[in-house]
């Protein structure tokens, strides 16, 4: 396993839609393992393949187990997992605002409004289709990582003024990281 370099915004790869994974082979399995190692090394909750320069529809996450009262049956959080070719099939009308950060936009966090619940289908490493219902941080992180796969940075959900300020700061931070 290897720690991969994380792509820092602004970078064209981060605003490019990732392509479907058509063959889940040993190279893809190795990439998933490397992404987990990279995410843990960077102390992140999630990491999309585009964030390590691979324009494929894959992300990894580790949302620690938590108990959420008053959540519908079948929803909740999970630990370490990954998704290949994820697709959200259902989003709740109910939305929540929470602060998010991103390994590709270091030293920033912003309040973002997102749907509270979702259902997502995806492929596992055995090429089997899976379905997951999610709420809380799990749902939020799935939406954040799926945005990456669609070429959308989380700061795009901000007003134009806040987005422009966030990108200006990102440019300064990137210069610091490149030194």
Curated annotation (Swiss-Prot):
Removes the formyl group from the N-terminal Met of newly synthesized proteins. Requires at least a dipeptide for an efficient rate of reaction. N-terminal L-methionine is a prerequisite for activity but the enzyme has broad specificity at other positions. GO terms for molecular function: metal ion binding; peptide deformylase activity. Binds 1 Fe(2+) ion. Keywords: Hydrolase, Iron, Metal-binding, Protein biosynthesis. Its EC number is 3.5.1.88. Belongs to the polypeptide deformylase family. InterPro entries: Peptide_deformylase, Peptide_deformylase_sf. It is an enzyme of class 3 (hydrolase). GO terms for biological process: translation. This is Peptide deformylase. Fe cation binds at residues 102, 144, 148. NCBIfam families: pept_deformyl (TIGR00079), PRK00150.1-3 (NF001159). Disulfide bonds: none annotated. The active site is at 145. It comes from the Bacteria. Gene3D superfamilies: Peptide deformylase. Its cofactor is Fe(2+). It catalyses: N-terminal N-formyl-L-methionyl-[peptide] + H2O = N-terminal L-methionyl-[peptide] + formate.
